[in-house]
Amino acid sequence: MSGVWVFNKNGVMRLVENPYNQSAGDSSESSSSGGNQQQRMRRKILVHLPSSEVVSSYGSLEKILKNLGWERYYSGDNTDHLLQFHKRTSIDLISLPRDFSKFNSIHMYDIVVKNPNVFHVRDM
């Protein structure tokens, strides 16, 4: 079960399973907190801080990661649906979906944590 916990206008919390596909039929909440909810659900972007470049493709991300010492990791089982990067100086592994359209904030924050002060996740 995944989703986002939101407050109704009467103060009761509820779980919204998939906030991006929530039906418009729930008008009781949309009038008071719909704007705030939309702000929390904005798309995220990954920004390379030294160059202020927005990462818009795996090509640009791979170039930046290589400059930081990351190498492509080819694992026999996962090559068809995952891109993986590792650093020889650590045990860290970055695993990303091969399809860039499935690259989301979870993957972005994984990159940020493993590369402190180099990347930042921002609202679009």
Swiss-Prot record:
GO biological process: regulation of flower development
Highest taxon listed in the record's lineage: Eukaryota
Compositional bias annotation for Low complexity: 22-39
Chain spans, region Disordered: 19-42
Tissue and organ distribution: Expressed in roots, flowers, and at a low level, in leaves.
Coiled coil: none
Family per similarity comment: Belongs to the FPF1 family.
Note: Overexpression of FLP1 results in shortening of the time to flowering.
Protein task: Modulates the competence to flowering of apical meristems.
Protein name, per record: Flowering-promoting factor 1-like protein 1
Species, as recorded: Arabidopsis thaliana (Mouse-ear cress)
